[in-house]
């Protein structure tokens, strides 16, 4: 008797207990499980990759790679693909990470936490999706099976990795936890197990995972604990299958397990079988032709079915012999579970409708409910004798990948809902190789809203500090509500930032005084202007004067005061070189002239946790100096925060305007390349993609950007972005005429379409810049 038959026959004995229903003999701590028929199996859990939003070329490449994975398994390596959708009724594993505090921000914190809880709860109505691959091989004992399974495990993980799929092997406890979840649907019963407890209690591993009861007395349904279940198989009748069939079943809001048991047919045996079928068809043709001759009609006229069978068999033989195709025997089952029988029947009906849509049929396993259920467990055991012959290509079309999820723990921030899976998107930018980010979207797309939502999430979930460079003044209301410092840099503003401020006590690789001298050199170069900039003698004189005006601070004298720009101006006038007078004359306008905005002591709190620098209402000359001074403040703040072990989130709005000045553009390249190493998390925002990409420095910035939020784009901008970022046509559809708050999120090598429907309330009013919303607020007031 073959091992397969032995395996199936064991399930025909009536189980006297719930434990006896579970078809394995022994589970070992390293994850090797012995099942009937002398097979030893191991299980891998693997993550999803982006297939649904990939380009046609990428989808073809994924299917080709998946075909290679399938072809790895030979006739001695049966394997099982398990797709388990579980409804979690316990506390969600993605918990809100915003701790309660007693401060002035309780109303905002409470509202944000409630929003986040609501979005997490809406994530597929609590459906959690898991994917497993279980493979087994025959062996005389576990000692013989262990090294062989180890090699297979390494090969399978390597094959998946080449597809970009992350996987991990499950140890014995992990596998028991999976089985416990499958036999305790609904997530009501916690899994409690430790190997050390087995000798103490005298219990077996099955005792820790078995439900209270199984009831398989009915022909078309069964009971597991308090839940109703139904086991069915997929009858594949379509001549051509769709890659959407499996995905649509798994996307349902239902608790179910889809299982594909796959047995590879030996290649020589498969070819021999097909040749035998072709010979049989040839004999049938000859018989039909003899009948035609005897009846007196054309012998070339054959029954249509016979012609079709002959053509299909010839193509199949060609595939097996020359196209790297293999033959598989597939058992495709679906086990639905629900709290009530009515809900169960509705769920089965829905799955059946999807099957019919793709010219397949879902058939109930009448009087085989027990065999169907135990075959769905991630053990590698198949008690169903219904098999369908499939080639590699037709098997690979049941592609096990849909969309990559992005749900991180710790200080992960909320970025909306996955538009494909409806799961919450939680990501931590600081875990990327480069945390640098960009927000790109046309006017009204929700670009500023998305950045402000991230900002408020950073404020509530972390202790990090935040700096906003705001050319239009849009962030001021939000920053004031967060207790931050709004600094308006303008000729008529009472706020002042001195470019001469210097912190001598920062532990840094470079001397603070040398860095300040370098900054003031570039500031003077900006002010003096000219094609050639400062001459060597002028640079020497400026450096000498900088050291003189900071002499007392450098010596650490108690009487030392922070100098002003005018002190540098006066020191330059005292120098004997004519070059010093030339520089001093250029500085005069900004010290004693009408543009003396920066010749005042700093009178704002630069140490506030949230600082917003508003650059609205500045002329061209002042704007350049203001931006240069702002950049110096950002650098100093990042250095100071890094010394304290705190990250700094920087937001640069209207980024395309800031890149127009070559000095500022080169500064941002340095930010994107160097400051990230000191805990800086910069974000650039713009609606003008053409101007952004016109900058000579944008290539360096994009090359160091691992985080990007793309919202609705104008047609010309879409074409530019598609070429620059390699966005597929399907992905472009998510930023084409999309609603506000809809778009694409790029996180490292993960691309996810997202939707953010933020509820109205105090936070919404702080974040929105839409004229109709602002008008509504004024009406309410």
Language model regions located:
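P-loop NTPase motor domains
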Residues: 49, 56-75, 86, 248-250, ...
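Post-Walker A helix-loop "phosphate-sensing" segment adjacent to the P-loop in P-loop NTPases
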Residues: 457-467, 637
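Hydrophobic anchor at the beta1->P-loop junction of P-loop NTPases
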Residues: 439
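Hydrophobic positions on the alpha1 helix immediately C-terminal to the Walker A/P-loop
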Residues: 450
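Extended, folded cores of ATP/NTP-driven motor/assembly subunits in large transport
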Residues: 1-401
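Conserved P-loop NTPase
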Residues: 725-780
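A short helix-turn-beta junction within AAA+ P-loop NTPase domains corresponding to the substrate/partner-engaging
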Residues: 483-487, 697-710
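Conserved lysine of the Walker
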Residues: 447
């Amino acid at each position: 008797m073959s091992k397969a038959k032995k395996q199936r026959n064991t399930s025909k004995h009536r189980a006297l207990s719930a434990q006896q229903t579970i078809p394995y003999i022994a589970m070992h701590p390293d994850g090797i499980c012995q099942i009937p028929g002398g097979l030893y199996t191991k299980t891998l859990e693997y993550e999803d990759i982006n297939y649904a939003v990939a380009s046609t070329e990428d989808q073809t490449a994924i299917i080709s790679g998946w075909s290679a994975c399938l072809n790895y398994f030979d006739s001695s390596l049966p394997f099982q693909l398990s797709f388990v959708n579980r409804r979690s009724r316990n506390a969600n594993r993605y918990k809100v990470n915003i701790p309660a505090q007693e401060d002035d921000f309780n109303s905002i914190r409470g509202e944000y936490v409630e929003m986040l809880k609501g979005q997490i709860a809406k994530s597929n109505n609590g459906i959690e999706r898991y994917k497993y691959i279980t493979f087994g091989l025959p062996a005389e004992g576990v000692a013989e099976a262990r090294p062989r399974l180890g090699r297979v495990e390494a090969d399978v993980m390597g094959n998946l990795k080449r597809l970009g799929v992350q996987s991990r092997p499950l140890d014995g406890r992990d596998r028991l936890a999976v089985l416990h979840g499958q036999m305790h649907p609904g997530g009501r019963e916690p899994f409690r197990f430790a190997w050390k407890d087995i000798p103490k209690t005298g219990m077996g591993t099955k005792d820790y995972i078995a439900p209270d009861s199984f009831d398989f007395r009915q022909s078309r349904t069964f009971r597991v604990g308090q839940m109703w279940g139904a086991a069915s198989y997929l009858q594949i009748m379509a001549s051509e299958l769709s890659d959407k069939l499996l995905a649509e079943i798994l996307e349902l809001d239902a608790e179910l397990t889809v299982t594909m048991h796959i047995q590879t047919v030996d290649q020589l045996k498969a070819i021999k079988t097909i040749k035998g079928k072709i010979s049989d068809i040839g004999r049938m043709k000859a018989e039909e032709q003899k009948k035609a001759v005897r009846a007196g009609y054309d012998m070339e006229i054959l029954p249509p079915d016979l012609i079709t069978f002959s053509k299909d068999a010839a193509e199949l033989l060609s595939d097996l012999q020359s196209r790297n195709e293999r033959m598989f025997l597939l058992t495709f089952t679906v086990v639905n579970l629900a709290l009530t029988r009515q809900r169960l029947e509705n769920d089965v009906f829905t799955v059946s409708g999807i099957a019919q849509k793709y010219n397949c049929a879902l058939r109930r396993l009448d009087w085989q409910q027990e065999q169907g259920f135990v075959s769905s467990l991630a053990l590698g055991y198949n008690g169903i004798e219904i098999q369908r012959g499939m080639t590699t290509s037709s098997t690979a079309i049941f592609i096990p990948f849909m969309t990559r999820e992005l749900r991180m723990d710790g200080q992960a921030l909320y970025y909306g809902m996955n538009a494909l899976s409806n799961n919450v998107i939680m990501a931590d930018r600081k875990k990327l190789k480069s945390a640098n980010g960009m927000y790109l979207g046309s006017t009204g797309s929700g670009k500023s809203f998305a950045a402000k939502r991230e900002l408020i999430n950073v404020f509530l979930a972390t202790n990090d500090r935040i700096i906003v460079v705001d050319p239009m003044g849009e962030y001021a209301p939000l920053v004031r509500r967060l207790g931050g410092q709004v600094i308006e840099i303008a000729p008529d503003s009472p706020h002042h930032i001195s470019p001469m401020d210097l912190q001598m006590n920062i532990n840094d690789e470079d001397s603070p005084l040398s860095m300040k001298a370098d900054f003031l050199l570039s500031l003077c170069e900006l002010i003096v202007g000219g094609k050639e900039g400062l001459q060597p003698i002028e640079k020497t004189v400026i450096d000498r004067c900088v050291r003189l005006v900071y002499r007392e601070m450098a010596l650490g004298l108690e009487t030392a005061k922070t100098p002003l720009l005018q002190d540098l101006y006066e020191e330059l006038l005292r120098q004997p070189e004519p070059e010093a007078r030339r520089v001093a004359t250029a500085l005069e306008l900004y010290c004693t002239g009408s543009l003396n905005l920066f010749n005042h002591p700093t009178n704002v709190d630069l140490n506030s946790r949230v600082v917003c620098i508003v650059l609205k209402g500045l002329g061209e000359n002042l704007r350049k100096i203001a931006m240069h001074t702002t950049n110096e403040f950002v650098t100093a703040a990042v250095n100071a925060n890094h010394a304290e072990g705190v990250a700094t989130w920087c937001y640069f709005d209207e980024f395309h305007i800031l890149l127009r000045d070559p000095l500022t553009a080169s500064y941002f390249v340095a930010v994107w390349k160097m400051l990230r190493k000191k805990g800086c998390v910069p974000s650039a925002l713009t609606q003008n993609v053409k101007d952004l990409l016109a900058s000579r420095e944008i290539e360096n910035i994009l090359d160091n950007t691992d985080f990007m939020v793309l919202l609705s784009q104008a047609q010309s901008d879409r074409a530019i972005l598609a070429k620059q970022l390699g966005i597929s046509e399907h992905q472009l559809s998510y930023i084409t005429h999309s609603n506000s708050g809809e778009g694409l999120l790029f996180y490292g090598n993960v691309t996810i379409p997202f939707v953010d429907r933020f509820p109205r309330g105090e936070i919404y009013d702080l974040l929105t810049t839409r004229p109709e919303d602002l008008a509504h607020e004024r009406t309410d007031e």
